[in-house]
Amino acid sequence: MGYRIVVAGATGNVGREMLNILAEREFPLADIAVVASSRSQGDEVDFGETGRKLKVQNIDNFDPTGWDMALFAIGSDATKIHAPRFAAAGCTVIDNSSLYRMDPDVPLIVPEVNPDAIDGYKKRNIIANPNCSTAQLVVALKPLHDAATIKRVVVSTYQSVSGAGKSGMDELFEQSRAIFVGDSVEPATFTKQIAFNVIPHIDVFLDDGSTKEEWKMVVETKKILDPKIKLTATCVRVPVFVGHSEAVTIEFENELSAEAAQDILREAPGIMLVDKREDGGYVTPVESAGDSATYISRVREDPTVENGLNLWCVSDNLRKGAALNAVQIAELLGRRHLQKG
């Protein structure tokens, strides 16, 4: 007994990670299909470490009738074409693109934060997965908001190149190698050299001077957690392959000591607190890669504002920021709304 699942975009970074996580979490499957563009038709992908190979089908020709859920990791343009088709056929779409996140008829879900919002999925038969940088942030904020009511958040991100896909990872690798041997580098995926550099620019610029990535963090956090929270973000691309980091300053309505915050975070779902005030007593992206937890370190009181705290938040962006959250949504949907076939 299980569900019939489709993974769309199975040849990309996030799609492959979805397959890994479905396998490692032993998701109850009656059947699984993998689809992608015509370029990948006939290719084979691994179903995690099970030893099972799955043949990629052309999404354009795939009939979703009779399938329970589809995990989409195919980008907004392809999602715009295929998500309505899958949803109309009765296959619930869990979408990793930005296309539907702010649609009022589509729930935007982080299961540790707003699981009850999933009950509204039937309006479109589509559920949205948040931006990678938003997902880990709201996991960290939720238990603290419940305890002391957050007024304002200031976040600076340090986002890995895998957030820009395989091309971003390839560009960091190739530029690093070129610099070591004295060759020149030409940016392609990124606007400037990414190797041995940081770039304060992710996605397009908006009229107010912010970037779309920063806007996403603001509006998605409000939709998922609380529309009254004020948030400002600066999003930066850094020369790290996997793992997003965030320096977060939080201002609360009510007093919350660093010690009390640590106790709350230690017990919160999805969070691993690693916070020793000593050399190496914190988590970096290297340790988070391949892990499902959202790691919190450096929790301390901010003396410049009343009821303020600072913290450091790290997570594998391909997992909690994308693939893991999608699988967790599928698990939640199955428990609450779907019957196993």
Regions found by a protein language model. Give the residues of each.
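N-terminal Rossmann-like NAD(P) cofactor-binding subdomain of oxidoreductases
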Residues: 1-194, 230, 258, 263, ...
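Oxyanion-binding "anion nests"
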Residues: 194-241
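Short acidic/glycine-rich loop or secondary-structure boundary segments that cap or lie
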Residues: 163-166, 206-209, 240-244, 258-259
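Generic solvent-exposed, charged/amphipathic alpha-helical segments
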Residues: 19, 218-222, 262, 266
